């Protein structure tokens, strides 16, 4: 079906970042924010080449005059026109390829609505004229990237988190748990608690500054209560951050209060279990015979698992929940920020995968619903 000399494109559309590149590469060529920005004000200078919309890094750099929108919320595409702009930007500006010449592997969150993947399929074939495409589940790709076929993946990006138990390469759908708590919620919470310190961040542009503070300074405490006492009694945990205008702000216990939300969602008023308990619940929904393998292969993936200290804390919390003699191993690969993309790159370059592509011909015969038969 697919010529060997044409590299497949791998596009991991996250809620926060798009990771795109060529199958067989060990890292994505293009990583840019999943943002479409539109001007807030009317352009007055003629000949400036002002556009009616900006995508990715360009939108990010002009954020002061734009209204920024993320077309993917909680892993689900909510604005298809903007999404099309992002794909167009990915193919033509970032990768500089003609999409009608390359098969495309796209990724999606587990438990996504069926209509969502149908629409993705339709746009690839009808708007971009792809010769072939495939939609893979993000967490499964992360497990591939870690070199395993069995394990439980905790995947947490910007918009959505999941625990996905996988046995011998098959995701176990009845045990997948989806948690609509991820990086974007942590950023919003950090904005809120910084306001309590007297720093005001409100606009979509300022939210990006807070996201940067989160990525550079936040960490997960091994013992939250103890860390709170340390922060209250000394300034050893305080760090300073310079804002774009030169003003310097200091943050203390916010550094770990922000990420603690992953373990205590009640911080932002959510009634769900924390990520440690969610992993445990997910394992408990699986057959008793395979639980041992899942406990010993708990793989973290996604950018919201990049907080220092998260693996040790998960280990401690899951050990407390699991049976006393159980061996528990949390795997946190250093490249986990991109492990979904890396898994996609591995999958799309396997010789055994080549018959799995949905071809243009199959699409023309069956329509968008073909995606449910060929991608599982």
Swiss-Prot record:
InterPro entries: Actin (IPR004000), Actin/actin-like_CS (IPR020902), Actin_CS (IPR004001), ATPase_NBD (IPR043129). Keywords: Acetylation, ATP-binding, Cytoplasm, Cytoskeleton, Hydrolase, Nucleotide-binding. It is an enzyme of class 3 (hydrolase). Gene3D superfamilies: 3.30.420.40, Actin, Chain A, domain 4. The keyword Cell membrane does not apply. Its EC number is 3.6.4.-. GO terms for molecular function: ATP binding; hydrolase activity. It comes from the Eukaryota. The keyword Kinase does not apply. Confined to aboral ectoderm cells. It is found in: Cytoplasm; Cytoplasm, Cytoskeleton. It catalyses: ATP + H2O = ADP + phosphate + H(+). SUPFAM superfamilies: Actin-like ATPase domain. GO terms for cellular component: cytoplasm; cytoskeleton. Residues 1-2 form a propeptide. The modification N-acetylaspartate is found at residue 3. Actins are highly conserved proteins that are involved in various types of cell motility and are ubiquitously expressed in all eukaryotic cells. PANTHER family: ACTIN. Belongs to the actin family. This is Actin, cytoskeletal 3B.
């Amino acid at each position: 079906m697919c010529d060997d000399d044409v590299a497949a494109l791998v596009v991991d559309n996250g809620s926060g970042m798009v990771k795109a590149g060529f199958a067989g590469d060990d890292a994505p060529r293009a990583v840019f924010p999943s943002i479409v920005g539109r001007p807030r004000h009317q352009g007055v200078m003629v000949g400036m080449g002002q556009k009616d919309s900006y995508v990715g890094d360009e939108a990010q750099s002009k954020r002061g005059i734009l209204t920024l929108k993320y077309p993917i919320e909680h892993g689900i595409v909510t604005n298809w026109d903007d999404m099309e702009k992002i794909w167009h930007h990915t193919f033509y500006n970032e990768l500089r390829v003609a999409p009608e010449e390359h098969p495309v592997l796209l990724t999606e969150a587990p438990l996504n609505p069926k209509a969502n993947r149908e629409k993705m399929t339709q746009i690839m074939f009808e708007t971009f004229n792809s010769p072939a495409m495939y939609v893979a589940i993000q967490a499964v790709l992360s497990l591939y990237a870690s070199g395993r076929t069995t394990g439980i993946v905790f995947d947490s990006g910007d918009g959505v988190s999941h625990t996905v138990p996988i046995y011998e390469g098959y995701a176990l759908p009845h045990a997948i748990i989806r948690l609509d708590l991820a990086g974007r919620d942590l950023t919003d919470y950090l904005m809120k608690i910084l306001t309590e310190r007297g720093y005001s961040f409100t606009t979509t542009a300022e939210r990006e500054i807070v996201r940067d503070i989160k990525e550079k300074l936040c960490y997960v405490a091994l013992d939250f209560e103890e860390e709170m006492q340390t922060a209250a009694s000394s300034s050893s945990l305080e760090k300073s951050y310079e804002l774009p205008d030169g003003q310097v702000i200091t943050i203390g216990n916010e550094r770990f209060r922000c990420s603690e939300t992953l373990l205590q969602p009640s911080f932002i008023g959510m009634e769900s279990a924390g990520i440690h308990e969610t992993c445990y619940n997910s394992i408990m929904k699986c057959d008793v015979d395979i639980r041992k393998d899942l406990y010993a292969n708990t793989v973290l993936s996604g950018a919201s698992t990049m907080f220092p200290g998260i693996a040790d804390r998960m280990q401690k919390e899951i050990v407390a929940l699991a049976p006393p003699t159980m061996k528990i191993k949390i795997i946190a690969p250093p490249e986990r920020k991109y492990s979904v993309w890396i898994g996609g790159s591995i999958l799309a370059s396997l010789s055994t995968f080549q018959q799995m592509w949905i071809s243009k011909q199959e699409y023309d015969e069956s329509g968008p619903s073909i995606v449910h038969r060929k991608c599982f």
